[in-house]
Amino acid sequence: FHRHQDAIANPHRPIPSNRLPAKQVLTIASVSYILCLIAGFLMSLKAGLLVIGLVIISHAYNAILKERGIWGSISLPVGIGLLSVFGALVVADRVPVKVWYVFVAIALYDFGTHITTTFKDLERDREVGILTTPLQIGVGPALIVSATATTAAFMVAILPVWTEDLLADAGWHYVCWVGIV
C-alpha cells in the first residue's frame, strides 16, 4: 500500500528495491490470508469470524489508518490485542474474563509503544506525508499519551490480582505472567 513511502524510507527492503515484485507480494499475501481464514474456520466458527475481523483491521491499518495519526496508533494495537482473544477461542471456544484484561493490557501497552516508535524520524514522516500521532497532536502530548497508556497497561494487567482472591481466582499462571511482564 505504501510502496512509494517505503522507497524513500527503506529502499533496501525487498519490495521497494524490486527484489520482490508487487504481483508476487500480492499473491503471497492473498494465499496467506486465505490459509488463515480456512484455518480459523477449521478451528471454530467464532475463531473464523475473528480472523475475518483481524484481516479487516490489518487491511484498514495498512491501506488507510497508518497515515491517520492516532487512528493508526489505535487500530494496530487492537488487532494485536485481539490475538489473545483468538487464542482463548481456539483453546476454550469462549473468552474468559481474564482474557479481556489481557486484551486491554496488550492493546494499551502496544498503543503506547507504537506511539514511541513513531518518534524515530518525524522529519521524514512529515516529508513523505505520514501523519503519525506526534505530528498530529504534538510531541509533548504524544509522550504523555504514550506514557499514560503504557502505565495503564500494567495497571490493567494486575487488576485481576487485586480484585479477586490472589491464587484461587486469578490463577498462579496469571500471577506468573504479570510477574514476568
Pin down the residues of each PLM region.
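Multi-pass membrane catalytic core of lipid/isoprenoid biosynthesis enzymes
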Residues: R3-V51, I130-A168
